[in-house]
Structures are given as C-alpha cells and as structure tokens.
Amino acid sequence: MKNIALISIFIFSHNSWSFEKLDALLDGLHQDAHEGKFESYFDRYSSDAVFLGTDKTERWTIEQFKSYAKPAFSDGHGWTYAVVERNWGGDGNTRWFDEILLNEKLGHCRGTGVVELINSEWKISHYALTMLVPNSIAAEVGSLTLEADK
C-alpha cells in the first residue's frame, strides 16, 4: 500500500511539473512577443517548426516566420495576446494544446499547437493562430472573406 501511495505521488507531481513547464513555455512565448524579445521568442520553437497565421497564405517555416516577424519586433514591441484559457493533451515527449487568447485588434483568437521534448527541453514544433468568429456573425464574416479573396 505504501508503494502505491508513493507511485501515485510521483505520477501526480510529475504531471504537475510537466504542465508547469509547458505552461511556462507558452506564457513565456506570449510575454516575449509582448516585450519584443525576438531571440527569446524564437528560441522557444524547434528548428523545423511551422507557424500558421490568420491569413490563408500564412504557412511559414520558422525561418520564414522570423523574416515576417522581425519588423514587428524591431521597435521592442511585437504583438500582445493575453491568455484567457489553455488546455493540454498528449503524453510522453509530444503534447498538444489549445488556448483562447485576447488581442485588442482581433478580439478572441485560438492558438493550437504541438510541443515536443527535444534534448530535454520543450520546444514548439507547430503553432496555428485563428480568429474566433461568433456564430451569430459567421455568415457575414464569411461573405467579407469571400469578397476579400476575389
């Protein structure tokens, strides 16, 4: 019985530690973006990461994303997304997440992605940012999108 209790404590403390590390990775990402810390922001991604932005043309390798982001970070202010909530899934060396974010210009957005444990360090290997559209205005937004695509 004592062994079961010790194993349970280890499992729960390990899971808690893992999620604290994972949350710190993403919280740090958003803080680095807010403060315009280019190097620290991109150090959180794996070398073969992919970033999907809100525009249909925005599917970038990490190097392409760096080129896009460099001007935004150059004045010490990247972009600001406040975390509203976050969920984690997966186990082992691969985890995935979804988070609701709030941006002053875009409103509520959703970030989804995958993180991997690489050389004992969690890295973001895939991140997708999407705008959240309330169902009550989805058709109107869809029409605007279709018109913009012409």
PLM-predicted stretches and their roles:
Residues 41-42, 49, 65, 97, ...:
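Hydrophobic pocket/interface hotspot
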Residues 8-43, 63, 93, 143-150:
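Short, low-complexity N-terminal intrinsically disordered segments enriched in polar/charged residues
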Residues 45, 55, 85, 99-103, ...:
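A mature extracytoplasmic/lumenal domain signature
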Residues 88-94, 115-123:
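A short, structured loop/turn motif at beta-sheet edges
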Residues 49-60, 71-77:
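A short gly/proline-enriched turn/hairpin at secondary-structure junctions
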Residues 1-7:
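Sec-dependent signal peptide recognition
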Residues 21-22, 64-108:
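Surface-exposed, charged secondary-structure patches
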Residues 118, 126-150:
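Low-complexity, intrinsically disordered terminal/linker segments enriched in charged
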